């Protein structure tokens, strides 16, 4: 006679906590600094969530964001616009149970290691860490032109931008994952602003409608607008997976990808006369 009994006493109903903080510093019209932090511990969840739906790990996040108008650091006569942006953020997820032995709590796995170096090594493997860094200069330009008519060589005709972003990820199955991006833009925009030349207007005084076409005939010797844009973008991606059978083995193949693109465009708008309108656009996309 077999008598099987399955008895369920209770759930591990330990609660967790969460906290969030934010600090914002405004330095007049020069800069803005924002610092934020967020934390959630094991067992935290909404009131209506069941035990299985609550967080089963510890989450820690913090970030620093800065906006700076570097042109404000120079004399006003320079008339430089240089918006600078920088951000740094990090997210760390600490598991409740050892991912290498899911029946053992992480605290017990760490207590079983005698050396501090061994405990640090286990944390580096089991913790999921994501780090983001971003830096950009958007729309850097001089707002000054010559006192007379706009000239092709005026610094105000040029606008440049630069951006760099790095994302680094590591965890139990990933030794390292790196994603880096660069972007550089250089734009040139020139509008001569030259008046239309009407060579016959001063010669023909008659208001006759028959001579109106000749009298009002106008020539634009220069284009109305010339626009050039050059864009360089580069991306590098690298992935090194972790050998869970042999944690010290770093011979797994490295996966990587790289792109380097150079895109150029030209736009020309020219009305040689009042009756003739000319527009030209050209673009080139190249992979380096």
Which stretches of residues belong to each language-model region?
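Exposed, low-structure sequence patches enriched in small/polar residues
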Residues: 1-288
């Amino acid at each position: 006679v077999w008598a099987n009994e399955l008895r369920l006493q209770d759930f591990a109903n330990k609660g967790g906590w969460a906290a969030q903080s934010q600090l914002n510093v405004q330095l007049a019209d020069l800069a803005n600094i924002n610092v934020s932090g967020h934390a959630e511990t094991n067992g935290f969840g909404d009131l209506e969530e069941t035990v299985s739906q609550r967080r089963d790990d510890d989450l820690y996040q913090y970030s620093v964001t800065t906006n700076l108008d570097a042109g404000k650091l120079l004399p006003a006569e320079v008339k430089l616009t240089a918006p600078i942006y920088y951000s740094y953020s990090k997210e760390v997820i600490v598991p409740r149970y050892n991912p290498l032995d899911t029946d053992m709590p992480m605290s017990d796995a760490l207590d079983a290691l005698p050396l501090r170096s061994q405990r640090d090594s286990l944390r580096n493997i089991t913790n999921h860490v994501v780090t983001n860094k971003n830096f950009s200069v958007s729309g850097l330009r001089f707002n000054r032109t010559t006192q007379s008519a706009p000239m092709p060589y005026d610094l105000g005709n040029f606008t440049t931008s630069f951006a760099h972003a790095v994302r680094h990820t590591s965890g139990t199955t990933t030794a390292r994952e790196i994603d880096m991006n660069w972007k550089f833009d250089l734009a040139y925009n020139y509008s001569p602003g030259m008046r239309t030349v009407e060579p016959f207007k001063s010669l023909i005084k008659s208001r006759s409608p028959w001579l109106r076409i000749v009298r009002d005939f106008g020539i634009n010797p220069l284009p109305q607008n010339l626009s050039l844009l050059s864009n360089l973008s580069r991306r590098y991606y690298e992935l090194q997976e972790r050998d869970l059978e042999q944690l010290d083995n770093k011979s797994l193949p490295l996966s990587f990808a790289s792109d380097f693109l150079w895109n150029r465009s030209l736009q020309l708008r020219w009305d040689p006369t009042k009756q003739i309108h000319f527009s030209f656009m050209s673009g080139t996309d190249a992979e380096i």
